[in-house]
C-alpha cells in the first residue's frame, strides 16, 4: 500500500468516531457482502466505512439532482465505493503521456464522408469481455490490447483476448513504460511491432503485478505492423476512425469521484479537465435521450458503470480530453 493510501486511511480513521452513522450499519454490511469486501484490521475497516459514507452521500445527492433533471447520468455504490478518487487514480489510472512525444499524425480524414449515426463494435463481435486490472496501473496495456484484439478479429475472424501482462512485463523502460506504475498505448504498440508479436491472455495470464518478461513466440496470438495517431483534440477524426477502422485507444481524465462511481447515462462533469490520466478504449458512439456519447470500455471489471462500460459526452468540447491522444494499431 503506497504512502497516499496510508495517509488517507490514517486521516479517515482519526475522524471516524465523529462521523460514523449507525443507521447505515446494515447497508454497510450488505455492501461488503455484495462485493466480497474484507479488511485485515479494524482500523482499516473504520477508515473505509468513513470513505464509503462520504461516497454514499455523494451518490444519493447526485441521483436526487438527476431525478430533477440536473444531470444526464446516475451514480452508484459499486466495488470502488470505499475508495477516494485520489486512491483510484494512484492505484488504477497511471497513464504516462511521453514528455517529449514526436506525434506522427498519419491519419487521413475525409470531411465529405457520410458516417453512421451510431456504432457499437460489440455488435460486430470485435470486443472481448471486460477485464479487471486490479490495483495495478496497467490501464494503458488493456487499452492497447483491446484495440489490437478488434483488428485481429476483423482480419482473421477470430476474437482472442491478448495478454496485457505481456505488455506490463515486457514493454518497459525502453519504451518509457513502467508496468503497474503506468505506460502509454502507442509505446505498447511499438513494443509489439519491435517484438513481432504478443502472446494470448490464455498463455500469459494477467497477475496485476510487475513480473519478468516471459514472452513465448510459440504462444503469439497477434502482430502489429504500425499504429495510427489521430489529430489532437479532434472528435470528428475520432468518430471517423471509430466508424471506419475499429475501436480506438484513448486517454481521459478519470480523476473525479463522479467517474469511478458512474452507473448509467451520459457522463458529463464540468470539472473534468483536458489532463488525461487513464487509458481506455472507445468501441462506439451514439445518442441517448438527445445526448451524444462515446461508448467506452474500461478495465475496472463488470461492477464498474454499465457492465464495465461508460457513455461519455461527445461533441461537448472534447470532454475529459478524450480526443487528445487517440491511436489504433494495424496488423
Curated annotation (Swiss-Prot):
Record's GO cellular component terms: extracellular space; lysosome; phagocytic vesicle
Key words of the record: Cytoplasmic vesicle, Disulfide bond, Glycoprotein, Hydrolase, Lysosome, Protease, Secreted, Signal, Thiol protease, Zymogen
Entry EC number(s): 3.4.22.27
Signal peptide bounds: 1-16
Propeptide residue interval(s): 17-114
SMART domains associated with the record: Inhibitor_I29 (SM00848), Pept_C1 (SM00645)
Record-linked Gene3D superfamilies: Cysteine proteinases (3.90.70.10)
Main location: other
Reactions this protein catalyses: Similar to cathepsin L, but with much less activity on Z-Phe-Arg-|-NHMec, and more activity on the Z-Val-Val-Arg-|-Xaa compound
Quaternary state and interactors: Monomer.
Name of the protein in its database record: Cathepsin S
Organism: Bos taurus (Bovine)
Amino acid at each position: 500500500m503506497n504512502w497516499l493510501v496510508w495517509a488517507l486511511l490514517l486521516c479517515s480513521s482519526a475522524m471516524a468516531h465523529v462521523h460514523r452513522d449507525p443507521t447505515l450499519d446494515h447497508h454497510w454490511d450488505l455492501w461488503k457482502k455484495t462485493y466480497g469486501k474484507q479488511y485485515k484490521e479494524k482500523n482499516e475497516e473504520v477508515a473505509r466505512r468513513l470513505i464509503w459514507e462520504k461516497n454514499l452521500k455523494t451518490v444519493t445527492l447526485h441521483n436526487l439532482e438527476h431525478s430533477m433533471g440536473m444531470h444526464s447520468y446516475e451514480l452508484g455504490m459499486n466495488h470502488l465505493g470505499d475508495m477516494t478518487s485520489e486512491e483510484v487514480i494512484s492505484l488504477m489510472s497511471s497513464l504516462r503521456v511521453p514528455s517529449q512525444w514526436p506525434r506522427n499524425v498519419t491519419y487521413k480524414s475525409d470531411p465529405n464522408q457520410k458516417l453512421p449515426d451510431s456504432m457499437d463494435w460489440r455488435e460486430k463481435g470485435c470486443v472481448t469481455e471486460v477485464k479487471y486490472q486490479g490495483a495495478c496501473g496497467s490501464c494503458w496495456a488493456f487499452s492497447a490490447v483491446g484495440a489490437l484484439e478488434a483488428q485481429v478479429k476483423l482480419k482473421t475472424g477470430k476474437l482472442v483476448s491478448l495478454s496485457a501482462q505481456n505488455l506490463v512485463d515486457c514493454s518497459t523502460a525502453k519504451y518509457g513504460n513502467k508496468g503497474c506504475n503506468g505506460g502509454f498505448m502507442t509505446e505498447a504498440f511499438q513494443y509489439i511491432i519491435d517484438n513481432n508479436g504478443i502472446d494470448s491472455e490464455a498463455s500469459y495470464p494477467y497477475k496485476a503485478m510487475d513480473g519478468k518478461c516471459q514472452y513465448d513466440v510459440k504462444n503469439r496470438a497477434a502482430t502489429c505492423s504500425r499504429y495510427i495517431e489521430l489529430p489532437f483534440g479532434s472528435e470528428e477524426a475520432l468518430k471517423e476512425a471509430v466508424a471506419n477502422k475499429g475501436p480506438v485507444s484513448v486517454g481521459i481524465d478519470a480523476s473525479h469521484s463522479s467517474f469511478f462511481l458512474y452507473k448509467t447515462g451520459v457522463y458529463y462533469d464540468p470539472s473534468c479537465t483536458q489532463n488525461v490520466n487513464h487509458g481506455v478504449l472507445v468501441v462506439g458512439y451514439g445518442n441517448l435521450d438527445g445526448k451524444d456519447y462515446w461508448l467506452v470500455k474500461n478495465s475496472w471489471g463488470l461492477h464498474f458503470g454499465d457492465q464495465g462500460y461508460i457513455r461519455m459526452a461527445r461533441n461537448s468540447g472534447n470532454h475529459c480530453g478524450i480526443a487528445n491522444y487517440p491511436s489504433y494499431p494495424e496488423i
